[in-house]
Amino acid sequence: MSESAFCIHPNVSIADEAIIGPFVVIGEPQRGAAPGELATVIGPGAIIRSHTVIYAGNVIGARFQTGHGALIRELNRIGDDVSIGSHSVIEHHVIIADRVRIHSNVFIPEFSILEEGAWVGPGVVFTNALYPLSPDAKETLAGPHLLPGAKIGANATLLPGVTIGRDALVGAGAVVVHDVPDGAVVVGNPARVVKQVREISAYQADALLGDLAP
């Protein structure tokens, strides 16, 4: 792809073997910052598809992939082998560990944490403001925290500050208002525990279950 077809701002480091699609922007300065003020680092083997915008100050590991039109705000830490689907939005100060998969049309706000191997289905919404527009809303922001191997079904909503336990499974369309225990399956609005992941035959041989396996 011709360099004229995308925009790479100053102070951006992209390792070898990257594939960058048309109309991609990398190193976009945050509001009030000058171009190149924050360093942006992307590891080897990245595939960044068309119309994706990556703000400055991100540190991204190896073999990173996006769909089309993903938006990644500033000052995030993203591990190796992470994929972010088309039209998903990652706000600033988010931590995404190795092997996390985020599908299309997902919204992840600032101060969220996704640990190793977490999986987020399409249309999922994380929230981080318990009382939006309240006087101390900005000071009390707290995003959801996904422990390793947590799986979030399509169109689920996670309320601020909830922790989704290791290898837990959140059903499609669930509204999670409380922490989810390790290995639990939750469904509904509000989400409630209905079984354990170890009871689902499809997961019995899943190496991600670790010591939760029977």
Which ranges hold each PLM region?
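Short cysteine/histidine-rich zinc-coordinating motifs and their immediately flanking basic loops
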Residues: 31, 199-200
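A short hydrophobic/aromatic micro-motif that marks alpha-helical segments and, especially, helix-coil
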Residues: 50, 203-205
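Residue-level marker of structural boundaries
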Residues: 191, 202-203
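Leloir-type glycosyltransferase catalytic cores
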Residues: 212-214
